[in-house]
Amino acid sequence: MEKFVITGGKPLHGEVIISGAKNAAVGILPATILAGDVCVIENLPDISDVAVSLKILSVLGAQIRMLNRNTYEIDTTHLTSTNVPDDLSRQMRASYYFLGALLSRFGKAQVAMPGGCNLGPRPIDQHLKAFSALGAEDSVDYGMITVRAKEGLTGAHIFFDKVSVGATMNGMLSAVMAEGQTILENCAKEPHVVDLANFLNMCGADVRGAGTDVIKVRGVERMHGCTYSIIPDQIEAGSYMVAAAATGGDVLIENVTPKHLEPITAKLRRAGVEVEEFDDSVRVRRTGDILPLKINTMPHPGFPTDMQPLMGVLLSVAKGTSTITESVWDNRFRYVDELRKMGANVQVDGQVAVFEGVEKLTPAPLRASDLRAGAAMVVAALMADGTSEIEEIGHIERGYENIVEKLRGLGADICKVDRAPAALESAM
């Protein structure tokens, strides 16, 4: 088992280049199945979720060739299976995108209930609702989800009961080769939803309206390959923005789309942080105190839930009382117990957390309970004077490429080391 060892109290300075978007990559990689051809995907982040997605494609029969660290050639012409292995499905939440892609091309698919972060129930009922409306039947037995369209898929009018990124993306994946037109309403509008639609259209699909409440998909008989570059990662960029602010640093964050960062930028500015925008970069610097905020997470273009733990860490040292209301995911406040170990004064009541700012955080042994909580703990450790250790860092590496190297490049004192096994573990 590995862990991060971080000695904090040093402002971050310098430049950091943002990787491709995880949430776009895990949708676009399954979408290559629809091409039935050769696709070249550029700007793929070198993270474990992408590695699992590529492994799934390989097991299904795709021919995969790495052109460089962030570019892969994927040939899905001759797939040999529509069943995603259980052990791979459970390693990442986004494995459910293989349901929509395989169903669309082959009329059937089987995937285990997805894994990934422990953020409470993440039901896929809205995904199954879309599949059913298009003419598929589904069953869930012993943790395996099976979908099948014996008579093929036919376009339909689908209204999602709640805004869901996953359901919106699976709705597009399953509809692109259905007969006729599909209308998806109450859709998610996140940048990675738009990125998936753009990729599908590059492959010959007819998807219109992505980024709005209503997406219209006109089915096509066949699709083809393309070369496509994934958008920069909005949440990775936001994470480094918060890290710069939290440490009192000055960081230029490159390879970003500033418009995608507007909800984060607005909150940081209200907290007293200077954010300067350029064409494809932002500069974040802080010289004064952090001011208290009220944050309510919402679907895009609201404040992203993935950034909530990171902002919580920042607000733990604000000059006053801050509140965060979590409106998207249950269990998103799991990081608070770890933050309290560092001296933070935080009270959680249901989906609302109240932060009474303290002067500073102190080092502590920490645990990454999920991806974004883990990133928040990294920032907290960077803020604290002294050395902290973070365990269960596999969660963090699911979504952050080269986080140790990137932070070191900004002057952070961080390393990854093997965790010595406990005595009981050694005896087993």
What are these regions (language model features)?
Residues 1-428:
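Short, structured segments at the rim of ligand-binding sites
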